Amino acid sequence: MKLRKLLLSVLMVAASLAANAQLNSSNATTNYAKFKKFFNDDICTELALPYSAMTDEQLREQMSDIAKELVDVAIKIKNDAWEKNEKEFRIAKFKPHTNPMIWEDYMNVYTYSLMPVPTGITGNYEYVMIFVGDDVPEEVSLSVCKVVGNDGHGFSYNSIKKGLNVVQMPGDEEARMLFLEYYVNTDTTATSKKLADYPEITLHIEGGHVNGYFDITKHDDAYWRELLATHKADSVLSSYKGIQVMGEKVMFHMSRDKIAAVCPNTITDAIGWWDELVKFEHKLMGADKYYDRWNDLIMARNGEGSYMYATQGYTYYENSTLAEILPWEAVYSSPGRIWGPAHEIGHVNQGTINIVSCTEASNNLFSNAMIHNVGKTTTRGVGVATCRDDYSKKIAFPLRGDVIGKSRMFFQLYLYFHAAEKDTTFYPRLFEALRHDRLNKGYQDSNWAYHTSATEDQLKFAEKCCEIAQMDLSEFFEAWGFFETMDETVVGDYGTYIVSLSKEEAEASRARMQRYEKKAGHLMFIEDRIKPSPRTDGVAGNRIDFNDEYAIGKMGSFGQWGDYIDESVKAQGYYYARSLNTITIKEATGAKGALGFKLYNAQTGELLDFNNGYKLTVPVAHANAPLKVVAAQADGTDYTVPSVADSDDEEMQLESLNATLATVKNLTSKTTTTGKEIGHFYKSALTEINALYKEAKAAADNKDTSKHSYKEWIALLEQEMEALKSNPSARAYLKELDVYTLTNGQLRSYGMCYDKYGLIANTTQQMANTLPNKRWMFESTGVAHHYYIKNKNGLYINDMADNGTSCSGEDQLTAWVFKANYLDDGTVYFTTQDGLYLAMDVNSYNIVAGKELVSAATWGIRAVELNNTAIEEVEFEAENEEVKSEIYDLTGRKVENPTKGMYIVNGKKVFIK
């Protein structure tokens, strides 16, 4: 059978070439000059008199010196002997199109379809005759290309011009479709020509075979069924296996059998919803304003393998997905199926907003926005909790690992400005602004890695958002890690990017954002999955969950996008209670208006935590700092949340008292009699607070307010705790010359150790605490609680990075300076000298690293060799404010003007002469 088919193919090809021997590109001009004399028009579609009244034999005799192929065309026209639907594709008008290779730069998009429109004519080893009736202007490009099946690119291009153009179709076992490229010269300037300034061009095409195509502007589903039924797939010379479905903005360039299997009866719904998807993306990116001069198409093609992707000229979808992404009924039954096409087309359109690391994230703006726009379900992606967790770890935005999570940053802007209708021109204007002032990925080195300044990438995006919105969005971008510093940080994103951002650059950018008067400190909380919201797809009821993972009820308790609309609603009825390092939000009767809660260091203004739930966590480094809790409100301002102690509700006051008692209990539970347990309080210093605790505890247990109200007990306890913590002689502090071991506060069997690779944490089974590399000494810098740290072998800690810490220097001049900070639970944590970063925390590899905020960052410190027993003598300098501010007598009272005698200076007993 195969041999017979091959033989038939060879014979037919030979016959075809022989038949075409009279007409080719070399003699086309001569033949055309003779042929068009018989017609009323230049494209030879209307025979003139008397030729139209002649018999076939008479006409052939008149045309005896013209190529037979042309004579056969004339006879067909005279007799109106067109096959069904043939004339529609043989004689057709074509609209001008813009060149995707030019407009990809104008619009900062990936290349749209490189094949604007099919002619519906196929061929295989045949000559095709193309009549062009008009002159082609210099600024216009007119050509044809041949495409095998549903290949994404054409090949063998031929320019065509006025007159007769003879084009040979290449071939093998499969025919080619002839595509037309009628490219006109338009641009984005105000003076540009419009598409309407260029005429439609009419072509008359003969030769080859009529395969046809579907056009939503011309055809209906009845025609679609007819097109599928009459397709001549069994003919060798017309064995074209593809089919095209033309929408207004999309072209399905598919395998005929695959699309017929999933859309056997109707195609208008499929191409219709894809058109709406592309129009929606265009509107969001502000591209629809150019529709009068830009009409490139998105191509969708199918194939075997490689699930879905976007590349130059087309988007691709695996055969098995077609049944789910083409018929609207199938898509609407599970709107998550919108995600794939919107995601891939989003790849084509994302360039303008594509921050480093976001190639698989920024395009999901279109996916989530389209799903929200359809109005049946909620959207996809992790919630505020993931952003919050990343913020607590100080992870820079490009390094945040959850791609769908990063997508929510873009979508939160959509929810606020578009869904909540704060400014529905926000994204179109943002895209337009960034098309003119583009994100800059930097230069590419010899290893193809890009060296990117975050100021020209993510921070340019953020600042442009503020500019377009005329709002201060700095806190939103802070929550997303935009201001975290990066020192040539390697980021993978379909290539290598080496990203840098200094603290000075970050703060300068933040300052520029904060110029805008209107604040948006609530934007980080906005969600569409906090509580049910009405459907907008014409069906009664509320939106259903996108899936169980992102279900309503799992994504937090505050921040539903609808609650942002009415800015007159103010927060009220909220209180907070603190227990150790956990802050819990409490609601009085009638509490309302909060969109989320934020925790600040009241002294520095630093944002410490935020949540769209009821819990906030005090970071280790701020455990002893003054705190401020606020509720974000719909107008972007914050409402200061009072403590439950300030509530008029007695039950809340009692709850606050119990929380305060728990704090006192924790504070006084770690004690020392010898001073070896660093950070612990001396038992002798706890007499007064223990007595007060006992009395207040009895009052709370018995609900007795006869002596003091609950508020008064709280105030007394807090006052006593503050007095205890400020008494320098009440707690055991680090001393020079003494030798210590450090045990991790979370990984309690792990001690800090130096090996040849740097600092690690290991167990006593791995290395005994008696070894010098596991014993540490602290040399004072002269500033209270600031130290150089070295092991007993004399090696200083002299370098610290995110992935490890070095302990290799023998010279104090190269050593790092660390500040020791004492926590209420008796542990100590270290920060860098400037206090900005937590240092010496144990990561998941048991490496002691720096500049991360993780839970294994506290240390229990114990003196194992006491060498500092002498009383020091110092010469007091009145002008030394650093010393003067740290002088106490032996009872713990601060001394402003000391005389000769023994005092506590910077935590040490000294004798002032």
Q: Predicted regions: what is each one?
A:
Residues 730-868:
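Lectin-like carbohydrate-binding module/patch detector with strong preference for beta-trefoil
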Residues 649-738, 789:
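Beta-rich interaction/scaffold domains
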Residues 23-83, 419-569:
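Pan-zinc metallopeptidase signature
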Residues 135, 150-164, 168-299:
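Zn2+-dependent metallopeptidase catalytic core
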Residues 230-441, 461, 465:
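Catalytic cores of extracellular degradative/oxidative enzymes
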Residues 865-891:
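Residue-level detector of functionally pivotal "anchor" positions at catalytic/ligand-binding pockets or at interdomain
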Residues 902-913:
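C-terminal tail/sorting-segment detector
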Residues 23-215, 570-648:
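Beta-strand-enriched, solvent-exposed domains that form extended recognition/catalytic surfaces
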